[in-house]
Amino acid sequence: MNQMNQTIIDAFHFRHATKEFDPTKKISDEDFNTILETGRLSPSSLGLEPWHFVVVQNKELREKLKAYSWGAQKQLDTASHFVLIFARKNVTAHTDYVQHLLRGVKKYEESTIPAVENKFDDFQESFHIADNERTLYDWASKQTYIALANMMTSAALLGIDSCPIEGFDLDKVTEILSDEGVLDTEQFGISVMVGFGYRAQEPKHGKVRQNEDDIISWIE
């Protein structure tokens, strides 16, 4: 195995779901900006980037979230940086958001936009994404997990620990963030949380996964 391959595999062995971070150790701005940048640069279906990253450093807000986040009790207290990843709602070709992407970000020629819109519509219909608001949201939420994985992997390559978290009361946390003016529920929902920092102690057990033969099939 060459050095680059070994570095990647070592990072995946290093990464584990860190339940408690060392509160005295803080991630440098340079390192955390790199982690955020890998989220921003992540791929998404149709290139629509249906996400928003909220870095919660405010202790009072963390405490409010803790009351309804059973899976983040120690992480909210100890993480150097704590991120909420929002998924955008109702991402279809003709929304203001997608129109802004096409014209303002991707700079499509005006004459090509109708064909792009038709491509988006056809894909979302054939893949049953556009069946209802829930299927649209679930599709957007799936995209956020690509960014989440890339952020955790880049963190591991930097020697930084992380923990993805779904263990929270969705309705209560949504209410808190809405009341705080952090979350516009017309535009976004909470997809997942993730804490970053440096482990308080080493994991008690090594990483255990299924064997390759159990989960990988080759068709040649």
From Swiss-Prot:
InterPro entries in the record: NfsB-like (IPR033878), Nitroreductase (IPR029479), Nitroreductase-like (IPR000415), Nitroreductase/BluB (IPR050627)
Single biological process term from Gene Ontology: 2,4,6-trinitrotoluene catabolic process
Xref: CDD domains: NfsB-like (cd02149)
Cystines in this chain: none
GO cellular component: cytosol
Keywords for the protein's UniProt record, in alphabetical order: Flavoprotein, FMN, NAD, NADP, Oxidoreductase
GO MF, one annotated term: oxidoreductase activity, acting on other nitrogenous compounds as donors, with NAD or NADP as acceptor
Listed cofactors: FMN
Entry EC no(s): 1.-.-.-
PANTHER family: NADPH NITROREDUCTASE, OXYGEN-INSENSITIVE NAD(P)H NITROREDUCTASE
Family indicated by similarity: Belongs to the nitroreductase family.
Protein name: Putative NAD(P)H nitroreductase SERP2086
Protein species of origin: Staphylococcus epidermidis (strain ATCC 35984 / DSM 28319 / BCRC 17069 / CCUG 31568 / BM 3577 / RP62A)
